[in-house]
């Protein structure tokens, strides 16, 4: 009886909550309910932390050089496209970089932003291949809690962003992230091409700097909300989530920077058997 009552309450809560969702995204893939993505992400976590390493335990690492080169440069091109779409749907065509609320209209620009937000959300599922490649190549030391957490929480939280607030100032971090990914995945693609291309990777330290700048800009941009009394952004809870996420990763990268470049400890080699060792965010 108690379980039945709890179930009924949960269903009523979900129905009351979901009625405020943006109807424009109802027919997009994975957007009808959070359940499909939760299942996918649950299977991902199970595979990369348990099943995958067990299956690979007595097997030789897969040689995935061509697949990784193709994958990384595909992400570069996809990120260029998404960055351009973010610019054309708001960030370069009218957004003020301050209190930009969500446009829920059916205007071409608003619908373009909706589509771009969904593309960014979907790209996070493609990027799960980062970890799967680690597992298949038996690079289990790179499958850290931070890595898996990042790749799991990003698509899961972005489902709610697309479902309720596809646009406005809450998308700045996505716009910035697509630009950063163009540089990052270019680096990973060159890494995957082998030792012959190591001479082109002298800018590894600047890659970490770029990621730090990304988190600083995201934190500053979202932090403006505390100083704008008349900002009527529709879902401020998303801004708190974004700011918390930005602050967490800013601190983590500052720690990495201090340990690697300031304290004087040696960095992991840029290449190990032709493959990169680097943070991916």
From Swiss-Prot:
Keywords: Acetylation, Disulfide bond, Endoplasmic reticulum, Fatty acid biosynthesis, Fatty acid metabolism, Lipid biosynthesis, Lipid metabolism, Membrane, Transferase, Transmembrane, Transmembrane helix. It is a multi-pass membrane protein. GO terms for biological process: fatty acid elongation, monounsaturated fatty acid; fatty acid elongation, polyunsaturated fatty acid; fatty acid elongation, saturated fatty acid; long-chain fatty-acyl-CoA biosynthetic process; unsaturated fatty acid biosynthetic process; very long-chain fatty acid biosynthetic process. The modification N-acetylalanine is found at residue 2. The chain crosses the membrane at residues 28-48, 73-93, 116-136, 143-162, 172-194, 207-227, 237-257. It holds the Pfam family ELO. A motif (HxxHH motif) lies at residues 147-151. GO terms for molecular function: fatty acid elongase activity. Residues 49-72, 137-142, 195-206, 258-281 are cytoplasmic. GO terms for cellular component: endoplasmic reticulum; endoplasmic reticulum membrane. It catalyses: a very-long-chain acyl-CoA + malonyl-CoA + H(+) = a very-long-chain 3-oxoacyl-CoA + CO2 + CoA; eicosanoyl-CoA + malonyl-CoA + H(+) = 3-oxodocosanoyl-CoA + CO2 + CoA; (5Z,8Z,11Z,14Z)-eicosatetraenoyl-CoA + malonyl-CoA + H(+) = (7Z,10Z,13Z,16Z)-3-oxodocosatetraenoyl-CoA + CO2 + CoA; (6Z,9Z,12Z)-octadecatrienoyl-CoA + malonyl-CoA + H(+) = (8Z,11Z,14Z)-3-oxoeicosatrienoyl-CoA + CO2 + CoA. Homodimer. Interacts with TECR. This is Very long chain fatty acid elongase 7.
């Amino acid at each position: 009886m108690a379980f039945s009552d709890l179930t009924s309450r949960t269903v009523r809560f979900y129905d009351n909550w979901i009625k405020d969702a943006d109807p424009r995204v109802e027919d997009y893939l994975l957007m009808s309910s959070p359940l499909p993505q939760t299942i996918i992400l649950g299977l991902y976590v199970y595979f990369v932390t348990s099943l995958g390493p067990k299956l690979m335990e007595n097997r030789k690492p897969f040689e995935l050089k061509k697949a990784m080169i193709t994958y990384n440069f595909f992400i570069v091109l996809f990120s260029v496209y998404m960055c351009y779409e973010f610019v054309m749907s708001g960030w370069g065509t009218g957004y003020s970089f301050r209190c930009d609320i969500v446009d829920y209209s059916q205007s071409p620009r608003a619908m373009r932003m909706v589509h771009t937000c969904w593309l960014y959300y979907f790209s996070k599922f493609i990027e799960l291949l980062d970890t799967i490649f680690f597992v298949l190549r038996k690079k289990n030391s790179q499958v850290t809690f931070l890595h898996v957490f990042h790749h799991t929480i990003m698509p899961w939280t972005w489902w709610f962003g697309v479902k309720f607030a596809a646009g406005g100032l809450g998308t700045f971090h996505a716009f910035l992230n697509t630009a950063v990914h163009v540089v990052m995945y270019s680096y990973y693609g060159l890494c995957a091409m082998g030792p012959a291309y190591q001479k082109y990777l002298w800018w590894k330290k600047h890659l970490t700097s770029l990621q730090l700048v990304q988190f600083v800009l995201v934190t500053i941009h979202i932090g403006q909300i505390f100083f704008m009394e008349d900002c009527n952004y529709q879902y401020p809870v998303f801004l708190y989530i974004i700011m918390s996420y930005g602050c967490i990763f800013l601190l983590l990268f500052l720690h990495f920077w201090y340990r690697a470049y300031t304290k004087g400890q040696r960095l992991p080699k840029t290449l190990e058997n032709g493959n990169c060792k680097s943070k991916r965010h």
